[in-house]
């Protein structure tokens, strides 16, 4: 049976065209063209200020994803903490299906819960408070009414502050809370969890379920999770 592929945390930006080139190479590969489905679990872009922003980066990525979709490859997207404002307009342009924060898939007989992963980091209370605020629909609507330049400046400032705060935060609170994560997996009746966000690529075998953490992408290394009837394995992008 055709495999499914999972990626997250590419953090694409015009400042790092090498990362965009890596993604486009994968999307154009025969492996992607023959996939059962491709799941992008958030932070595809380093930041997103609205579907009305038109750039060479956004357009080229949407165009290549659309080509896969037109070939019959299902492409799914879960919003991340950097690109949570991606909406239906961009997803339609790219031929992607927008998924909610949590979804359960039947992958080759294994009930699999997928999410970006930021909601699992409950020990980072400051971030969770911030997340709750910026996910308010009314606030998002007001933000998207601002001129594009204002939105970009505000997003850049918030990103700068977030980066500074991250440097002084204890590493453990930026990882998932084990107890909360286990409860979520049980609540959804899943046997496996796949998420990104923490950038700590690993396959964990925990009490009663498998937790797979996707890695972030770098110019010199990127990996893709391949899932098929034989299980799940990380494959270096260079193999494609």
From Swiss-Prot:
<dbReference type="GO" id="GO:0030145">
    <property type="term" value="F:manganese ion binding"/>
</dbReference>
<feature type="binding site">
    <location>
        <position position="43"/>
    </location>
    <ligand>
        <name>Mn(2+) 2</name>
    </ligand>
</feature>
<keyword id="KW-0378">Hydrolase</keyword>
<dbReference type="GO" id="GO:0008758">
    <property type="term" value="F:UDP-2,3-diacylglucosamine hydrolase activity"/>
</dbReference>
<dbReference type="InterPro" id="IPR004843">
    <property type="entry name" value="Calcineurin-like_PHP_ApaH"/>
</dbReference>
<feature type="binding site">
    <location>
        <position position="43"/>
    </location>
    <ligand>
        <name>Mn(2+) 1</name>
    </ligand>
</feature>
<feature type="binding site">
    <location>
        <position position="166"/>
    </location>
    <ligand>
        <name>substrate</name>
    </ligand>
</feature>
<feature type="binding site">
    <location>
        <position position="169"/>
    </location>
    <ligand>
        <name>substrate</name>
    </ligand>
</feature>
<feature type="binding site">
    <location>
        <position position="197"/>
    </location>
    <ligand>
        <name>substrate</name>
    </ligand>
</feature>
<feature type="binding site">
    <location>
        <position position="124"/>
    </location>
    <ligand>
        <name>substrate</name>
    </ligand>
</feature>
<keyword id="KW-1003">Cell membrane</keyword>
<protein>
    <recommendedName>
        <fullName>UDP-2,3-diacylglucosamine hydrolase</fullName>
        <ecNumber>3.6.1.54</ecNumber>
    </recommendedName>
</protein>
<dbReference type="InterPro" id="IPR043461">
    <property type="entry name" value="LpxH-like"/>
</dbReference>
<keyword id="KW-0464">Manganese</keyword>
<dbReference type="InterPro" id="IPR029052">
    <property type="entry name" value="Metallo-depent_PP-like"/>
</dbReference>
<keyword id="KW-0441">Lipid A biosynthesis</keyword>
<feature type="binding site">
    <location>
        <position position="116"/>
    </location>
    <ligand>
        <name>Mn(2+) 2</name>
    </ligand>
</feature>
<feature type="binding site">
    <location>
        <position position="197"/>
    </location>
    <ligand>
        <name>Mn(2+) 2</name>
    </ligand>
</feature>
<dbReference type="GO" id="GO:0009245">
    <property type="term" value="P:lipid A biosynthetic process"/>
</dbReference>
<feature type="binding site">
    <location>
        <position position="199"/>
    </location>
    <ligand>
        <name>Mn(2+) 1</name>
    </ligand>
</feature>
<dbReference type="InterPro" id="IPR010138">
    <property type="entry name" value="UDP-diacylglucosamine_Hdrlase"/>
</dbReference>
<keyword id="KW-0444">Lipid biosynthesis</keyword>
<keyword id="KW-0479">Metal-binding</keyword>
<dbReference type="GO" id="GO:0019897">
    <property type="term" value="C:extrinsic component of plasma membrane"/>
</dbReference>
<feature type="binding site">
    <location>
        <position position="162"/>
    </location>
    <ligand>
        <name>substrate</name>
    </ligand>
</feature>
<comment type="similarity">
    <text>Belongs to the LpxH family.</text>
</comment>
<feature type="binding site">
    <location>
        <begin position="81"/>
        <end position="82"/>
    </location>
    <ligand>
        <name>substrate</name>
    </ligand>
</feature>
<dbReference type="Pfam" id="PF00149">
    <property type="entry name" value="Metallophos"/>
</dbReference>
<feature type="binding site">
    <location>
        <position position="81"/>
    </location>
    <ligand>
        <name>Mn(2+) 2</name>
    </ligand>
</feature>
<comment type="pathway">
    <text>Glycolipid biosynthesis; lipid IV(A) biosynthesis; lipid IV(A) from (3R)-3-hydroxytetradecanoyl-[acyl-carrier-protein] and UDP-N-acetyl-alpha-D-glucosamine: step 4/6.</text>
</comment>
<comment type="function">
    <text>Hydrolyzes the pyrophosphate bond of UDP-2,3-diacylglucosamine to yield 2,3-diacylglucosamine 1-phosphate (lipid X) and UMP by catalyzing the attack of water at the alpha-P atom. Involved in the biosynthesis of lipid A, a phosphorylated glycolipid that anchors the lipopolysaccharide to the outer membrane of the cell.</text>
</comment>
<keyword id="KW-0443">Lipid metabolism</keyword>
<keyword id="KW-0472">Membrane</keyword>
<feature type="binding site">
    <location>
        <position position="9"/>
    </location>
    <ligand>
        <name>Mn(2+) 1</name>
    </ligand>
</feature>
<dbReference type="GO" id="GO:0005737">
    <property type="term" value="C:cytoplasm"/>
</dbReference>
<keyword id="KW-0997">Cell inner membrane</keyword>
<feature type="binding site">
    <location>
        <position position="11"/>
    </location>
    <ligand>
        <name>Mn(2+) 1</name>
    </ligand>
</feature>
């Amino acid at each position: 049976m055709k495999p499914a592929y999972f990626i997250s945390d590419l953090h694409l930006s015009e400042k790092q065209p090498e990362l965009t080139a890596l993604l486009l190479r994968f999307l154009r590969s025969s492996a992607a063209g023959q996939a059962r489905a491709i799941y992008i679990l958030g932070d595809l872009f380093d930041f997103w200020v609205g579907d009305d922003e038109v750039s060479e980066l956004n357009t080229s990525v949407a165009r290549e994803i659309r080509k896969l979709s037109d070939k019959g490859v299902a492409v799914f997207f879960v919003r991340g903490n950097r690109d949570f404002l991606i909406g239906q307009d961009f997803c339609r342009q790219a031929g992607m299906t927008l998924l909610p924060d949590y979804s359960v898939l039947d992958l080759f007989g294994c009930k699999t819960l997928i999410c970006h992963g930021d909601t699992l980091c409950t020990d980072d209370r400051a971030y969770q408070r911030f997340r709750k605020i910026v996910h308010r629909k009314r606030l998002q609507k007001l933000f998207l009414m601002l001129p594009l330049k204002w939105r970009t400046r505000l997003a850049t400032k918030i990103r700068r502050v977030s980066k500074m705060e991250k440097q002084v935060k204890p590493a453990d609170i930026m990882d998932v809370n084990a107890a909360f994560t286990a409860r979520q997996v049980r609540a959804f009746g899943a046997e496996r969890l796949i998420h990104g966000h923490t950038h700590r690529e690993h396959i964990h075998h925990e009490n009663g379920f498998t937790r797979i953490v996707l890695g972030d992408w770098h110019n010199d290394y990127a990996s893709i999770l391949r899932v098929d009837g034989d299980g799940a394995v990380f494959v270096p992008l260079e193999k494609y």
